[in-house]
Swiss-Prot record:
This is Bifunctional uridylyltransferase/uridylyl-removing enzyme. Residues 457-579 form the HD domain. GO terms for biological process: regulation of nitrogen utilization. Residues 182-204 are annotated as: Disordered. CDD domains: ACT_ACR-UUR-like_2, ACT_UUR-like_1, HDc, NT_GlnE_GlnD_like. Its EC number is 2.7.7.59, 3.1.4.-. Gene3D superfamilies: Hypothetical protein af1432, Nucleotidyltransferases domain 2. Belongs to the GlnD family.
């Protein structure tokens, strides 16, 4: 690689030192051309560092500092020769003694020239050796900087001092402990995971800093300049070096593109850039493949790379601790406890008896994890053993998987009562799980390009198992009281664990992942000794793992017919119990924001109602009249001491049977009391209370007012202005043209029922808006969140007829956006449609809402009318989505 514009010639020909700025632009252009013509990112990064060395040396001489006894050092990434297009140029000017006034003036001119002439935006420190000693003693960052410093030009006698200073001020142990604590804090800032949706490729676990960490600690002890030198010292293997170098090149290349796209030193792989960078790496989508195929494959490579780096970081630093730090501790005496012919405990961690254990006895691979799963006192795996284990993972082939002894060991791990989740995480991390179940290996690192699934598929799967395990722990029983009780009585927990492992295992293949996963599970279960009935139960759970959540989300579970239909699909309590535990664990493992007490109450209601139907007999028809009478009786029992039965009956006469079928006795009593206390006052009634099903973050709003065309649209517009998210709505019109509306809302700030002033503000805003029958409140203009602008969601509208209710069911799926429900409500109002109920769901960037509507005469739309309205509604949604895209 030859840069065609040598700096000295360039400055001479332009007769102006300020030409360095243009020279930098020219060489950057040449570097980009070299990259596009096939030069490796390592060549480009090194060339850029050398060119900056050349420029700084030129400016150093121009400032007259070449005649001084000072030294100019590159530090940070520049010291490591890791320079990307917009990387900081960090330098240190070092003096053996205090700096003279003359040199201070020259240094000032040199630093100014870096800004004014070269536009380097440098990070600069000026220190004497004594300054370095004082600062390095108390500042880990300074000590780290000194370790990777590199003399660019100046006094060669100073080159030895930076590392000598660190050796004097930090011992191996103090430096190692401090760097490990620093890494732990850094990882915590990134959720201790490699699989964030928008990862920081430099600082997150598995990023560039994790590779730097290995270098810093090794360089401090072994006094080497390159990671490559550690191979000759026996600290890392050739294979590990190859993995690190390939990972480093890949991450540098991503960072290279991030810098050029954002025109700054950017390390975050944001949604803004993921698609474009995927294309630059050659990832494309063939016809028929999912729309996000290319970006998901690129991110899969990233997550797998980050996992490799993270694992090597863990292993190599543990190896350093065990081989260098611990043996040097005062009074250290290694504690060894024999286990069997394959394993022993060394200082509380598992270690092989000899280095050929895994090659001579392959079953020891799974035996190791059996010991970990069933002996909580074991603290982990020794680093040397871990290195052998990672290499042994490659031995797991079909012959290994078909071995009955290995199958028995694997199922013994799954049935462990102690730490199944941690053990499976280790098995995944070290390559065992993905090799033993090859289909699981295919989903490792697989992300779904949306805001709903915030974990990779493999991480989500193991979190699901963690959640299932938590259902048996007392500290989580208060958060999941019903499901914990159900889980405790499951006859075979291994059935739900295997359903969890396989429920998403077919994602990314195309086709129905539930169906394909069920097929994989049956084959696996048969091979592992399950009866045919047990195999079918596991497969049924996988095939139907979305049934319960979709029923609660999209259907009216207060409708006895809905419950009966759902219960008939299950057939018995065994299927209900297994599906309930799997579903709750699944939702909680998908996205922490998805689970709230409102959703918990829906799941609990669906489970309870279905349980009652199954226990009373699936063949029994629903006795609607008996349900109505029972509900009325329970409600009247609550009201009898406050009002006469005649007064109560007078109110109830205005309400239809549907009201008493779908509202609870408690809610009916609440509504009736408010109406009777209000008397003949024409003003709307607005009441707020916590949701009856112990949904602490959900608020019920009851509205009783004269019916009018824009009632729903007006209400949701006001609620949107009040920062309240509607989850459920039920609108019932009484015979005297009064409407009884119940909304369940989630409060974005969580203060609605604890702040009397805010509660009063919400009530007054609703009363005022509902009292002005001819006015419709305008929509709030809110800033669209950045992430939403990068998702191309196809807007869909589906209108069907519910023959029982004689209502149209309008299902919409669109990009979530501020004020969406209010905007949709306005469209219904303009079309003269009455909304009777609504089910609202926000799944990441996607809104999936269902409305039950009729025309003003109470009749459903005809087929032609529904077709026309569907087209109008989709057009409006498309226009709203286009506005969001145009803001990007």
């Amino acid at each position: 690689m030859i840069i065609t514009s040598p700096l000295l010639d360039y400055v001479t020909s332009h007769q102006d030192i300020k030409a360095i700025n243009q020279w930098r632009a020219d060489v950057e252009q040449q570097l980009q051309e070299f990259y596009e013509n096939g030069y490796s990112i390592r060549d480009i990064v090194l060339a850029r560092s050398n060119l900056i060395d050349e420029a700084l040396t030129f400016l150093w001489k121009h400032a007259g500092l070449d005649q001084s006894d000072l030294g100019l050092f590159a530090v940070g990434g520049y010291g490591r020769r890791e320079m990307l297009p917009y990387s900081d140029v960090d330098i240190m000017i070092l003096s053996e003694n205090d700096i003279s006034p003359e040199h201070e003036k020259q240094i000032s001119g040199f630093i100014s020239s870096l800004w004014d002439v070269g536009n380097f935006k440098p990070g600069t420190s000026v220190r004497s050796i004594q300054n370095c000693v004082e600062q390095a003693t108390n500042d880990l960052t300074v000590a780290t900087t000194l370790i990777e410093s590199r003399l660019i030009t100046g006094n060669p006698d100073l080159a030895k001092w930076p590392r000598r200073i660190v050796s004097q001020t930090w011992t191996d142990k103090t430096f190692f402990d401090a760097k490990m604590e620093e890494q732990a804090k850094r990882h915590a800032q990134h959720n201790n995971t490699e699989s964030n949706l928008e990862p920081d490729i430099k600082n997150a676990p598995g990023g560039i800093r994790d590779m730097n960490q290995i270098g810093w600690i090794a360089k401090r002890h072994f006094r080497v300049n390159r990671i490559y030198d550690l191979v000759h010292l026996g600290f890392i293997t050739e294979y590990e070096l190859k993995v690190l170098e390939e990972a480093e090149s890949f991450l540098w290349e991503i960072r290279h593109h991030l810098h050029l796209l954002s025109k700054r030193d950017e390390n975050r792989l944001l949604f803004d850039h993921q698609r474009e960078i995927a294309a630059k790496f050659g990832y494309t989508r063939a016809e028929g493949q999912p729309v996000n195929f290319a970006v998901e494959q690129f991110m899969k490579r990233y997550y797998r790379t980050a996992q490799q780096v993270s694992t090597l970081n863990e292993m190599l630093l543990a190896y350093f601790n065990e081989s260098v730090i611990t043996p040097r501790l005062p009074n250290y005496e290694r504690k060894i406890e024999e286990i069997n012919e394959n394993f022993k405990l060394v200082d509380g961690k598992l270690a092989v008896q000899h280095h050929k254990v895994f090659s001579e006895n392959p079953s020891a691979i799974l035996e190791l994890f059996y010991l970990l799963a069933n002996h909580p006192e074991i603290e982990g795996i020794r680093a040397r053993t871990l290195r052998l284990l990672i290499m042994a993972a490659k031995r797991i082939d079909q012959e290994f998987r078909d071995n009955p002894a290995h199958q028995a060991l694997f199922m013994a791990i799954i049935r462990s009562p102690y730490r199944l989740y941690d053990t499976l995480v280790d098995m995944k991390r070290y390559g065992i799980l993905g090799n033993y179940i090859p289909a699981f290996g295919q989903i490792m690192g697989l992300m779904q390009y949306d805001l709903f699934h915030i974990y990779t598929v493999d991480a989500h799967t193991l979190l699901l198992i963690r959640n299932l395990n938590r259902f048996k722990e007392p500290e989580f029983a208060q958060h999941f009281p019903v499901v914990s009780s159900v889980f405790q009585r499951l006859a075979r927990r291994d059935i739900v664990y295997l359903a969890a492992i396989f429920h998403d295992i077919a994602k990314g293949r195309g086709g129905d992942h539930s169906e394909l996963g069920a097929e994989d599970a049956i084959e696996f279960c048969r091979a592992h000794g399950f009866t045919e009935r047990e195999c079918k139960l596991v497969a049924w759970l996988i095939h139907n793992h979305l049934l319960m959540s979709l029923t609660a989300q999209k259907k009216d579970i207060s409708d006895p017919d809905v419950i009966k239909e759902f219960a008939e699909k299950l057939g018995d309590m065994e299927h209900l119990d297994y599906l309930y535990t799997l579903t709750v664990a699944d939702i909680n493992a998908t996205n922490p924001k998805l689970w709230n007490t409102w959703r918990a109450s829906l799941m609990r209601q669906l489970y309870t109602y279905s349980r009652d139907v199954i226990r009373s007999g699936l063949g029994r028809p629903v006795d609607y009249q008996m349900l109505i009478e029972d509900t009325k009786f329970s409600a009247s029992e609550t009201l009898v001491n406050e009002f006469s039965l005649d007064a109560v009956e007078k109110v109830w006469q205005e309400l239809g049977d549907e009201y008493f079928l779908k509202e609870s006795a408690d809610e009916i009593a609440w509504h009736t009391r408010a109406i009777l206390q209000h008397g003949d006052n024409p003003a709307p009634i607005v009441l707020l209370r916590a949701h009856r099903q112990s949904a602490q973050d959900a608020v019920q709003i009851f509205i009783y007012t004269q019916d009018k065309p824009n009632l729903f649209a007006t209400t949701v517009a006001v609620l949107d202005r009040m920062n309240l998210d509607v989850q459920d709505a039920r609108i019932i019109t009484a015979t005297k043209a009064f409407s009884l509306d119940t909304y369940v809302v989630l409060d974005r700030f969580g203060t609605l029922l604890t702040d009397p002033e805010r509660e009063h503000t919400v009530k007054e805003a609703l009363i005022k808006a509902l009292s002005q029958s001819d006015k419709y409140p305008g929509l709030m203009q809110r800033r669209i969140p950045r992430q939403l602008r990068h998702f191309d969601i196809e807007n869909t509208v589906d209108i069907t007829l519910n023959p029982v209710l004689q209502q149209n069911m309008v299902e919409i799926s669109t990009l979530d956006q501020p004020g969406l429900l209010a905007r949709v409500g306005g469209l219904f109002m303009m079309q003269g449609l009455d909304i009777h109920s609504a089910k609202i769901a926000t799944l990441g960037e996607r809104a999936e809402d269902i409305f039950f509507v009729t025309k003003k005469d109470g009749q459903p739309m005809t087929t032609d009318e529904a077709h026309i309205f569907s087209a109008q509604l989709k057009l409006a949604l498309d226009e709203a989505s286009n506005q969001i895209v145009s803001q990007h």
